[in-house]
């Protein structure tokens, strides 16, 4: 599977008749697992649709109190309705930007509405690391990356790494497709 440099535009809503949706979901999980990720948004694999897959089981030892073992979701057309709670700072990285990470501050709780894989409408509250993962992936759907949340100084500090990524001059375990390449 090719892993795309994400588009920087808002993704489109989809409906139940979207072509090959179940196969796209399976392919996204496979791509995410092969890259040793915990979440993947459709724009990262070249699909400009509002679709996210998450499986954070690999984080269960690092966050024993958050039940990461069972945190596996498919979010179709997710919308973060509300962000609230104390600010929560956490080191974020991304499959789209290999070898780059930094501390990002976000609200600690969210309310998100989405359709699950069976097209049941869900409205749920998430907190802590679970909220963080959903916020990060939903940013992709809105054409944003975690680096957009950095201060100008911090962004300047990683600029050379970002340029290497955009020129395909970085080593990573998974195949990527670069914009303009």
Show the residue positions of the predicted features:
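Active-site rim/adjacent substrate-binding subdomains
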Residues: 8-135, 140-181
């Amino acid at each position: 599977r090719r892993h795309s440099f994400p588009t920087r535009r808002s993704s489109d809503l989809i409906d139940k008749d979207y072509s090959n949706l179940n196969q796209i979901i399976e392919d996204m999980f496979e791509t995410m697992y092969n890259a040793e990720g915990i979440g993947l948004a459709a724009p990262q694999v070249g699909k400009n649709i509002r679709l996210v897959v998450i499986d954070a089981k690999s984080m269960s030892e690092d966050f024993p109190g958050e039940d990461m073992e069972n945190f596996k979701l498919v979010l179709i057309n997710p919308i973060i309705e509300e962000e609230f709670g104390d600010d929560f700072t956490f080191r974020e990285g991304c499959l789209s930007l290999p070898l780059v990470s930094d501390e990002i501050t976000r609200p600690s709780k969210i309310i998100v509405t989405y359709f699950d894989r069976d097209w049941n409408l869900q409205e749920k509250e998430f907190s802590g690391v679970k909220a963080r993962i959903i916020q990060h992936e939903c940013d992709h759907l809105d054409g944003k990356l975690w680096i957009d949340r950095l201060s100008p100084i911090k962004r300047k500090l990683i600029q050379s790494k970002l340029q290497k990524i955009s020129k395909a001059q970085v080593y990573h375990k998974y195949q990527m497709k670069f914009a303009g390449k």
